[in-house]
Amino acid sequence: MPGDEASPQSPRSPRSPRPPRPPAHTPTALPAPPAPRPPSDPLPVLDRAERFIWLTARVLEQRRFAFHFLDGDADAVDTALGSYLNPDGGYGHALDPDLRGPLSQPLHTAHALRVLDGLGRCAGQRIERLCRHLTGVSTPDGALPVVFPAPHDYPTAPYHPMHDDPPGELLTTGPVVGLLHRNRVWHAWLFRATDFCWDRVENLHRTHPYEVQSAVAFLDGVPDRARAAAAADRLGRLVREQRLVVLDPRRRAEYPPAPGYAPGEQLFPHDFARRPESPARGWFTDEEMRRSLDFLAAAQQADGGWPVRREAWAPGSSLERRPIATLEALLTLRAYGRLPARVSRPGPVPPR
């Protein structure tokens, strides 16, 4: 399926006039830093990332880093995640940094399930209560909206507009359904939600990168593997035809961001195929995947963290998002053998 690429375009002359300043409502992003050469020894990568995590991350991301890379305790991650849990069984309190305020929101649910999946703890009474919560907040078609309307003016990212009667979206429903299926959760809520996802995935025509990511998350966990493989093959062709993925980071100027995305907010093969067993891995050649992972490794900044390509809309959200991006980068690099398969360096030692 991977095909030939177009020839590179002529670069803009350095003396060309600066393009006009975008209107105030146009998404903006911090300028991309120069990409350093990836280090040959993986330990400095982890050392720098660890320092960045201790300096900037929330308690949850600190505990997650310790669990995944320092033989930390899963209970500590669980406890940190529990501080975002609401009495209704959902998650809030800016667990996803793009949605501020205490209210339970579907994006927070997807974030919590990713954390629990990484711990191997996506089961039990907590998940039963969560599914009951999802049953009570679903749209008439059994799906989840991106953002529920809030009784107070809690801040949200401008790319997540709030509607009085929001429709169900694959963007949120896909990851939640996929992660529950991946962990063999069975609940009545999943029946209609799964049908919704199948309908959206198999009828996608014009789409955008984050919606594709959500479709991949659904296909990654859904039980019908033959149907998932067929849907993934079709989706991969669509992604390449619509140029939704930067296949060669050296030619990223040829892949403009999707409408509504910030300048530089482009996705690469590793953003879709986060693990070698992902249904999206077959969309890309070995060479395309190698270039993508080289680019990811080289994107580590001088402070040890990875950049965020989304629109910078609030200082707190941007600060909280970078450690999350750093953890995702490290986990992806390790999944592809770019870091040690299991890091067992000693974790933090409490004072005597």
PLM features: residue spans?
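Preference for long, amphipathic alpha-helical scaffolds in soluble/luminal domains
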Residues: M1-P8, R15-R21, H25-R352
